[in-house]
Amino acid sequence: MKALVLGLIYAASTTSVLATDPSVPYPKGYRDWHHVKSMVIKEGHPLFASFGGIHHLYANDKAIKGYRGKSFPDGSVIIFDLLEDVQDGSAVTEGARKVVGVMHKDSKKFKTTGGWGFEGFGGGDPSKRVVGSNAAS
């Protein structure tokens, strides 16, 4: 699953042609969901070129059950919110949103990827889909 997530974020951060297939819905209100963790990837990290910045991971109620148990039920949604990191004196603050990556569990709809559909929204804009019709690959 980690490789699939990294692939989603890579596609979202490097794709310039935006698709329009709404297979995975935009997660309205995701910042009010469960906050799972945050991290900052800084220059010098091997993934900095593609994934540098502040990462926040959010999960809906069903996904939290998956984190606590052994499997994620259908309807689980996990969000990878990637923002630029801005140095502000001795602090790091959030800059512009780079992408909102979404993993949506639906075993019937996304059979070829273990039940997960993937989408990235460029700059967090619901109209800027970067995965589109490839949501299940």
Annotate each language-model stretch with its function.
Residues 6-7, 17:
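Cleavable N-terminal signal peptides
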Residues 20-48, 69-137:
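Sequence context surrounding c-type heme c attachment/ligation sites in exported
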Residues 53-68, 88-89:
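N-terminal post-signal-peptidase region of extra-cytosolic proteins
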Residues 2, 18-21:
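Catalytic cores of secreted/periplasmic or lumenal enzymes
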